[in-house]
Design a protein with these regions (language model features):
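Short hydrophobic membrane-inserting helices
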Residues: 1-13
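Interfacial alpha-helical end/capping and short helix-turn segments at domain and membrane boundaries
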Residues: 1-2, 50-203
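Transmembrane signal-anchor/signal-peptide helices with a preference for the extracytoplasmic
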Residues: 19-43
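Membrane-proximal amphipathic alpha-helices
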Residues: 34-45, 55-63
Length: 203
């Protein structure tokens, strides 16, 4: 073999080794990255599942309690009893910004599009409901809180024993508070199902 041919052969072999080494390093890097992503995804989904399970339990209890309270109030009004009006106070542990934080922490890259869609659906509906609850609370602060010591005649027409016009939304506010938790429970159950499907898929 000519010296030039030997040099070309040696150079080709060295180049091939370099290529194989680079490819192996790339493959190992890629494998390690996929493994890390899988671990992060599993931790993220496990944490999310735990939070959602807790939310479902709380939402169910509150929906039941608020629904009963609203029905009892409506029944008393219908019976002409003129029950007292209390300040409307709406409390929920849900914070829509938690979803944004989750997505910024890598959720967008790691989670299945269907899981992300379920998360965003919960966030969107909750924001709409919270806006309504905020309006009810403002009305309560303006109309009920300053007059909480007033007698029933202030809130009801004594002749008809029906709520005066400016207080007519009060029973609806109680009912809507219960409906919020009913829908929240339903949406969280759908989200939980999707989380479990994704965890099963990546086992």
């Amino acid at each position: 073999m000519r010296p030039t041919a030997r040099k070309i052969g040696k150079w080709t072999a060295e180049l091939l080794l370099v290529f194989i080494g680079a490819y192996a390093a790339f493959w190992l890097n890629s494998y390690q990255e996929r493994h890390r992503d899988a671990q992060r995804r599993d931790v993220l989904l496990a944490s999310l599942e735990e939070d959602v399970r807790g939310s479902i339990g709380v939402a169910h209890e509150r929906a039941e309690k608020l629904g009963q309270d609203a029905a009892a109030f409506r029944a008393k009004v219908d019976a002409g009893e003129m029950p007292p009006l209390y300040p409307f106070v709406f409390i929920t542990d849900y914070n829509p910004t938690d979803v944004a934080t989750l997505l910024q922490a890598g959720g967008v890259e790691l989670l299945d599009p269907k899981t992300l869609a379920a998360l965003r659906k919960v966030e969107s509906r909750v924001r709409a409901w919270l806006g309504l609850m905020e309006r009810y609370q403002k009305l309560s602060d303006q109309l009920i809180v300053p007059n909480v010591d007033q007698g029933p005649e202030f809130f009801y027409d004594p002749a008809t024993k029906k709520l005066r016009k400016r207080f007519e939304k009060y029973p609806q506010s109680l009912e809507d508070a219960g409906k919020f938790f009913e829908e929240f429970e339903k949406l969280e159950k759908e989200l939980l199902q999707q989380i479990q499907l994704e965890r099963q898929k990546h086992k």
